[in-house]
Amino acid sequence: VWGDVPLFIEPTEKYSEAIYKERTDKNYIIDNVILPDLKKAESLINRNKNYERKRISICGVWAIMADVYMWTEQYNLADQTIDKMADIKSSKGRLVDFEPSIQTWHTMFTEELNNKPSDDTPENDEYSTKEFIFLIHFNMDEVGTNGYSYMYQWFSGSGNRAAVLSDKLMSVFNEPDMQGDLRKAYTVKDYQNGNELRKYMAGDISNSLNKTCEVAYPIYRYTDMLLLQAEARARLGKWEEALDLVKKVRDRAGLVTPTALSFASEDEVINYILRERQVELVGEGRRWFDLLRTGKWKEVMKPINGMSQDGNELF
């Protein structure tokens, strides 16, 4: 988001000139602060108690760690870290897993994320779907009238249409190999000549404009990890293994996946995986950071909004 930033590793209890620091190189922060923090968390977290998805579990630690490894181009480590998740068990079996049903994929956003109570029992997992790894919990006592039940009116609850899907995304849905994508009907709502994000909507836009509900927001889920792992394996030259992971996701969406022979270069495979992430994870805050991480933000954004100068990508 910011690139190089000032580094503080001790609390600041009062004002002094010492709070003004020069920026520290982002790679130093990743290597010497973020990754050591994650490895410490990995060693300390209770793997037999922390199952709740609105708190960090060991799989949540690994999800962040794998994400960091992808940013630092340590693809073997990202691949190995994601593999670890399959071994974590709770009383209900695997803690995280792939959800093969498109109907359940839909209801996990519209029902599973809605109206979960706050509690202090990390060993109690309220979620029936294992897709979610970590999410931000919403409590009605804390947020009040948020209008969050429909993402397009999130900011005011009065129909500001804050999450309108772009024409670029809609053109992806219209590509030949995306015809019949079962996710489209659950992702897009044509409303007042615009394409609204309906991923988190259980009903229709017009029947409850100011409805407020307690909806958690997914930060990491297992399909996100599988597609990251596909990208890592593609970077390692394992194209078939990468596409096998993509196939699981596209099978659920009712789509066909090509074989490795259909691609002429690693970059083609990577772009194919990134497009799948764009569609699968729409509304989950992933696309922009995928473009930054892979260095593709200029080629993608310049035709859309003219972004092309180094520094434009940072706040």
Feature locations, PLM:
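Short, cationic low-complexity segments
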Residues: 154-183
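Active-site-adjacent substrate-recognition loops and nearby beta-strands
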Residues: 146-155
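Acidic/polar-rich alpha-helix caps and helix-coil junctions
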Residues: 1-146, 176-315
